[in-house]
Design a protein with these regions (language model features):
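Residue-level signal for well-ordered alpha-helical positions
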Residues: 19-20, 59-60, 100, 140-141
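Histidine- and aromatic-rich ligand-binding microenvironments
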Residues: 8-9, 48-49, 106-111, 131-132, ...
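Conserved beta-strand segments of alpha/beta enzyme cores
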Residues: 45, 83-85, 142-146
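Acidic, PIN/NYN-like endoribonuclease modules and their adjacent C-terminal/linker elements
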Residues: 1-5, 23, 38, 115-149
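Active-site neighborhoods of divalent-metal-dependent phosphate/nucleic-acid chemistry enzymes
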Residues: 83-133
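A generic structural signal for short hydrophobic patches within well-formed alpha-helices
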Residues: 13, 53, 134-135
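Short, well-structured N-terminal submotif of metal-dependent ribonuclease cores
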Residues: 1-48, 60-73
């Protein structure tokens, strides 16, 4: 397990940038501080699956102003950091994606959640999320080293 690499999901990114989204913070203060550390040092590396940005634009692109803010204050800021990566959906991630089964009959994962979880599997690192379905799934299946919420 890599102790210095973390995959960040959409709800964690929204929590960190809660002032832009005018949203509640859903992750712990220690997870916020970990993300903040990556924005101010190169001690740790953050991985953002491309699905995070797709989900942001689908759910939060309400007008041109918020779209511009997402691009300039979030996307470019991450893109320009040496210790942050926007990860594409590659073959290994796809293979891990296909290994993920629905956790409960009445609670299916959406494609974004599965891609994000599969990215953490591929990178063999912890996931920063507050998504209870992903947390429960990993408790049952133990496919990634851990989840920080």
């Amino acid at each position: 397990m890599r102790q210095d690499i973390f995959v960040v999901d959409t709800c964690a990114l929204i929590s960190y940038f809660s002032n832009i989204f005018e949203a509640n913070i859903s992750i712990s203060q220690s997870s916020i501080e970990l993300i903040d550390l990556a924005f101010h040092t190169n001690e740790i590396k953050l991985i953002f699956p491309s699905a995070v940005f797709i989900e942001l634009f689908i759910k939060w692109f309400k007008d041109e102003e918020i779209g511009a803010r997402i691009k300039t204050e979030i996307y470019y800021r991450i893109k320009n950091r040496e210790n942050m990566q926007i990860r594409t959906f590659d073959r290994e991630t796809l293979e891990n994606y296909m290994r993920i089964q629905n956790i409960e009959d009445d609670k299916n994962f959406d494609g974004h959640d599965k891609q994000i979880f599969a990215s953490a599997m591929t990178m063999e690192c912890q996931l920063i999320t507050s998504d209870e379905r992903l947390i429960r799934y990993n408790k049952k299946q133990n496919l990634i080293p851990g989840i920080l919420n």
